[in-house]
Amino acid sequence: MSARVALDPLEAGVFGWFQWPPGRGRANAGVIVDPDGITLVDTLMTPEQWAPFAGEVEEIGLPVRRTVLTSSSVEFAGGTGRFKLAAIYGSAQASLHLDQPPNLESWQALYPEQAEGFAEVETRPVSHVVTSDVQLTPSTAVLTTGGQMSENLVALVEGAHMLFAGAMCSFGVTPLCWQGDPAGWADELDRLAELAPIIVPGHGPIGGVEDLRDQQAYLRACVAARGDPSTLPPGPWDLWADREHDVINVERAEMLAHGDSGIPPSMLRLAGLA
């Protein structure tokens, strides 16, 4: 179970929602306040997570106008149905995924602690497909990127020197790259490193460029492993949660190196599909 959390003020009009202990199934979210209303960055997963989050967001006293999805994964998009009047901004890939019927059995296999809550999860489709960088509000720019999936989004609050990286960053938690490109993800982190010194990841505590570089080194080590996770060298990741993701990340990198963009068999096993 996730520990009780609350909105964490990060800067004037900017809040984070950090789930503890960090790990798969316990993603973060962001709240950015503009004069016309609120922009959310991701919406958490099941009612146990998004109900208290929504309650605290409502206490701000402004309408939720916009939701930016950094990924289509249910960890980030599961609460979209709770914010029924918000416009949903996502990538074309996220839009495609969210138009498909949910796979409850896989969700329950991947996130067993939240298995009972998925019966109440109704994701909303993307209403605004983002294909290029855009200044969404006076405070927030939405930038296109990719790596965790082929197409991800991040939200930059330049005035707060803060990047809501969502699914693109995972600090203290092993990233999971079964539908993206570990090598391309590592390269794209170079661009994100230049955007802001403060980074709010999709999993784990708030961090900075040093944490991003640790993640980058891990992803490059997965590529260099050439399909054998036992050859991963020691590093900061030795202390990370969810090291069962290693085999998936290494397998995905090796499959892509040989022109195979299919789902890694190790991911199918984790999701209860093999």
Map each language-model feature to its residues.
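Metallo-beta-lactamase
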Residues: 38, 45-47, 96-144, 146-222
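Hydrophobic/aromatic beta-strand patches that form the interior of the parallel beta-sheet core
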Residues: 15, 68, 89, 128, ...
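Active-site metal-binding motif and surrounding structural segment of the metallo-beta-lactamase
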Residues: 47-90, 195-196
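Accessory terminal helices/loops
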Residues: 194-198, 206-274
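Short catalytic-loop micro-motif centered on adjacent basic/acidic residues
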Residues: 16, 39-42, 65-68, 141-142
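Short, acidic/turn-prone active-site loops that include or flank metal/cofactor-
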Residues: 92-96, 169
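Conserved beta-strand hairpin/beta-sheet module of binuclear metal-dependent hydrolase folds
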Residues: 4-55, 154-167
